[in-house]
Amino acid sequence: MTDIAGQQRRPAYTVNVAAAAAALGLLAFAADSVDGVAGHVMVALTSSGFAWGLAAVLAGRHADTMRRAVTGATGVLVLATVLYYLLILLVSRRWSGATLADGSSANMAGLRSVAVMTAVWLAGSLLAGPLLGLLGYAVRANTTRRAALAAGIACGLLSAEGWHAIVQAPPWRLLALGDPFFYGVAFGEIVRVVLPLAALGWLVAAHRLGRAWPMLLASTAAAATAGTLLWYALGLVQGA
């Protein structure tokens, strides 16, 4: 069995889930207003699939029951999504102020866009939250081999957004453009891959999973590949 020292009980667990959701939503909203290289780094750290997915995995890891792992991880993502889009709707109001080709207001189109994206990410939260929560719980509460499988799947999925970005726009090509803006894009892509691998290393050390390294490598590679395809499909939905 792996280390079980990380579990939390109510009410501390509920408070921590709510605090994590608030932090995710606020930081993601703040990252949108940062320009340049710093902006790309902020987005990679606070408003990426890695950042939000890791929060869900950790919510599952610290739960004391499987059911709470599911509800906690899903709650983090749902609450953060709602807060983020509420801030866009009420504070930044970046959906408003534009005009159509005929000179009329584009506010309704902007509101529809916010509504659609809110629905898409809420659906994603409801699908990804339970899975990531269960993976986090399995890392802590299962045998070494099964914990290694869960850790590899989790971190492979967390790195998928970065791999998808690298496939779409390889960082070496971006760096060759010699533009500081694209330097930031390239750095953000790399961060989205390096940090999930660092998280995997931490889980391996914390739960002594090194003996199951073949399982770790295979599950990480398979999950990263599957996750990259899912991000590609999501891009098609967003562009439709």
Question: What do these predicted ranges mean?
Answer:
Residues 71-80, 150-157, 213-226:
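Central hydrophobic cores of alpha-helical transmembrane segments
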Residues 41-53, 109-127, 181-196:
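Alpha-helical transmembrane segments of polytopic membrane proteins
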Residues 1-94, 103-107, 111:
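N-terminal topogenic module of multi-pass integral membrane proteins
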Residues 160-225:
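Hydrophobic secondary-structure block in the mid-to-C-terminal portion of proteins
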Residues 86-175:
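Membrane-proximal helix-loop-helix units in multi-pass membrane proteins
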Residues 3-13, 58-71, 130-149, 200-217:
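Cytoplasmic membrane-interface segments at the C-terminal ends of transmembrane helices
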Residues 228-240:
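Juxtamembrane boundary at the C-terminal end of a transmembrane helix
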Residues 24, 28, 79-84, 128, ...:
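Alpha-helical transmembrane segments of multipass membrane proteins
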